[in-house]
Amino acid sequence: ALSAARARDVPKVATGFIANVVCTETFVSGLDPARIFAETMSVMPGTGLISWALDYKVDRVRKDVTVTLLGLGKSHAVYRGEGLGCYLDHGGPVADISLPPMESKPALLPEIAGASIAAPQSAQLAAALDRAFAEADKSTPRNTRAIVVMKEGHIIAERYADGIGIDTPLPSFSMTKSI
């Protein structure tokens, strides 16, 4: 019974995840929905089996995204506004949220980074960045979007994928780590 319940949930889970990612990266990050959809599909295990059956629609006026899977699953994500991001709309009432006023603080960039993108200062670091952005195996792409390397409180190297820059907000899930 447990496996049947999980199999039954696959369409809703897949469409919900994709709807939320496409919504967030379209309306928060400002990226192209077609790129987001393709890159998301390429890194999700098992989606190659269902990608042909998935469809998405972005409504830039209403600021929402709908993803369907052959009519078996349909999910709708809505952008709530600056600082609130996107949420999955399950059809129920939506709580009215007001954010507290943001405290205006100057950016720390002048203290931790230079005036321009920090190029790696060693061949080893440059090679590591090259490897991180290389797409050696097209069947399992990395889709690396940004890497910022800090040492002793200062940015010592950074690199961004095409269409991504210093000011591009990106969702990070749990991939942002420090060693």
Give the positions of each predicted feature.
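Extracytoplasmic/secreted proteins, especially bacterial periplasmic and envelope-associated proteins
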Residues: 18, 22, 124-127, 174, ...
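Short, compositionally biased leader-like segments
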Residues: 27, 94-128
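Active-site SXXK
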Residues: 147-155, 169-179
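N-terminal accessory interaction module
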Residues: 45-94
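Conserved aromatic-histidine-acidic binding/catalytic patches
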Residues: 7, 11, 15, 141, ...
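Beta-lactamase-like hydrolase cores
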Residues: 113-150
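N-terminal low-complexity, Ser/Thr- and acidic-residue-enriched intrinsically disordered segments
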Residues: 2-49, 54, 62-67
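A short acidic/small-residue loop/turn micro-motif
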Residues: 157, 161-165
